[in-house]
């Protein structure tokens, strides 16, 4: 799994669908 700082830091994606995906899977599962 990717470092959480990537997803929770300043560069965290603001796309709500991606946030839902993250909360459901508990992992950074999207592609950049």
Swiss-Prot record:
Keywords: Chlorophyll, Chloroplast, Chromophore, Magnesium, Membrane, Metal-binding, Phosphoprotein, Photosynthesis, Photosystem I, Photosystem II, Plastid, Thylakoid, Transmembrane. Chlorophyll a 1 binds at residue 19. Chlorophyll a 2 binds at residue 22. Photoregulated by reversible phosphorylation of its threonine residues. The keyword Cell inner membrane does not apply. Belongs to the light-harvesting chlorophyll a/b-binding (LHC) protein family. The N-terminus of the protein extends into the stroma where it is involved with adhesion of granal membranes and post-translational modifications; both are believed to mediate the distribution of excitation energy between photosystems I and II. The light-harvesting complex (LHC) functions as a light receptor, it captures and delivers excitation energy to photosystems with which it is closely associated. This is Chlorophyll a-b binding protein 2, chloroplastic. It comes from Populus euphratica.
């Amino acid at each position: 799994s990717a470092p959480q700082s990537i997803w929770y830091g300043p560069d965290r994606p603001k796309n709500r669908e991606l946030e839902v995906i993250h909360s459901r899977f508990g992992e950074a599962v999207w592609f950049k």
